[in-house]
Amino acid sequence: GPPLEDSFQRCCGLTEAGAAEAVRLYRERYNPIGVYENLPAPGLAEYCRQWRAEGCRLALASSKPEHLCEKVCARFGFAESLEVIAGSQPGAGMTKADVIRLAMERLGLTEAEKRRTVMIGDRKFDVEGAAECGLPCVGVEFFGYAGPGELQAAGAAAVVRTAAELDQYLRS
């Protein structure tokens, strides 16, 4: 999703200062506890290992702070499959597109590789950020974050419901 500050302002009507305080309070609990309450999508870590073994270059581009992305990826078995873990940088005010660009920059993609790159995302912000970077985005509903029709309306190249469907789509 979008940066937390933006969400608190848009969804809760908070001022910039109020949103900053809400983020501080949120992270006060999330950083030591909530980060470990996530659940991975069934089968996704295994597919990531398989894709990596087959030569795919995998990266994470998240609006979460990068140090938290690293914790989550390590906890759920994704870190060894990812060549790059890119998250938001403190105080940088990064958009989703900024984080995607950061991941692609760190990967050092050639123009040919960029043409074969696809974003996989669970919210409209992922689809929109990918489009801003010139990438197609496959929407995934198996995380349960997107509302009904959200990914299609945002322009996802395809929408899948399971990790197996994602694998099947990527191989087609």
Describe each PLM feature range:
Residues 96-127:
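Conserved Lys-Pro-Asp/Glu-containing loop-to-beta segment of HAD-superfamily phosphomonoesterases
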Residues 44-73, 86-88:
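Substrate-recognition element of Asp-dependent hydrolases with the DxDx(T/V) motif
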Residues 36, 79-83, 110, 157:
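Conserved H-loop
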Residues 79-94, 116:
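A short, structured active-site edge motif that brings together acidic residues
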Residues 1-45, 52-54, 67:
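N-terminal helical cap/lid subdomain that shapes the substrate entry/recognition surface
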Residues 45-52, 104, 127-132:
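Surface-exposed amphipathic alpha-helices with a cationic face
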